[in-house]
Each structure stands twice: as C-alpha cells, then as structure tokens.
Amino acid sequence: KITETGSVWWNIMDSYNTRTQIRSNAAEALLAMQGKESRSWKNYKFKRYSAGHAYLKDGEQCMIPQRIAERAARMGYYLKSIISWCKTASMPEPQQSRVSRNVEYILHLTIQRTPYFDKKSYLSLSPELGGKQSFESEKLSDFWHLPTSAGGEGHGAQFPVQLPGRCIALTSRENDIVLDPFVGSGTAAAVAAVLKRRYIGFDICDKYLQTAEKKINKATNK
C-alpha cells in the first residue's frame, strides 16, 4: 500500500491504432523494431486489428498516457504531472505520414495533494544518478532530456539509470521502500539501493530476476 506522502511514477509510451502482431515479450518486440522478425502476419496466433474501433480511427494516435491519467484521477489519485522524457536516441519508424516518436511520458500520481517532494535533489544529486544534466535548465520542469539505456542485458526495454534515480530521489527519503512491480533487469532496484532506499521488485520472468539480482549486487558491491 502506498503511503500518504508517497508517489507513483508510471512510464508509458503512446501508440497508434494500427494492425499489429501481439508479441510475447519486450525482447521479441525489439527484434521486430529492428527489422529482424521473420514471421509473417498469418504466423501469429494473437493479433490486434485497427478497424471497427469505438472511438479511434485506423492509424490514429491512441493518447494512452492521457487516458490512463484521466482514469487514475477518476479513481481518486492526484495527477501531479505528465512529464515528457525526450530521449537522446530512439528506434526508427518506417512511417511516411507522420513524425517519428522520440518522447515517452512519465505520469506522477499521488493519493494526496501535497506529497513528499524534494525538489532540491535535482541539483544536489549526481548527474549519473539522475541529477541535473549539463544541458538541462536549472529549473526542474516537466521536460526531461535524459539518455536512453545502452542495453546489453537481454531486456528490450531497459531504463537509463538517470530516470528511476531522479524519480526516487525526488519523492522518497533514505530507508523508504521503493516498489517496482515490473523489475525487469533491475535498474530501478539497483538505483534505489545506491540511494539507500529499501526496495521490492518482482517480475513474471525468472531470467530477468536473475539479471536484476546480479545488477543489484554489483551496485552495492556484494
């Protein structure tokens, strides 16, 4: 259960209402984005169709972050910010009718109007852990210009260290508990440990849990 002064950070990328295959994991989706997926449309058991949708036209942007934010607000959460994370690099998109996506969104949700928020940590935290980058303004805004992850650990959707580091530093104190319900390669948990927070992480994939444990041990010199 989230504490009264706690925060929820939710990173999500928008999508388009297009016909697509439903892939089983992030690594499989990454191969497809890189053009290395050899299966054809008919070989997929699960598929998403874009025609006949109740409120989205074929090829239209879905506005997923905004819809989640609206629903969360109706459930009683406070939507504090929708932050734009402008990545230094992104996957190419073979689209000729629109611009390519280079922004992901981070929803900051709380259960009360005035959560714990340490704005000074933006300037005091090391840039390697999510503090102010050399090309960012002195003012902490809702536009974050942070690098993408170099990857290399078998997970197709890794965070850069700076992203969870900034979120954790802004909205928690030392010894607080950080929960990551999709721990993946363990980046958020490792950063939480470095910042002297306790952490809980779980994932549906045992392979990722093993990777996460190794990353946490390395970060804490165990």
Regions found by a protein language model. Give the residues of each.
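Core catalytic lobe of class I
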Residues: 1-211, 217-221
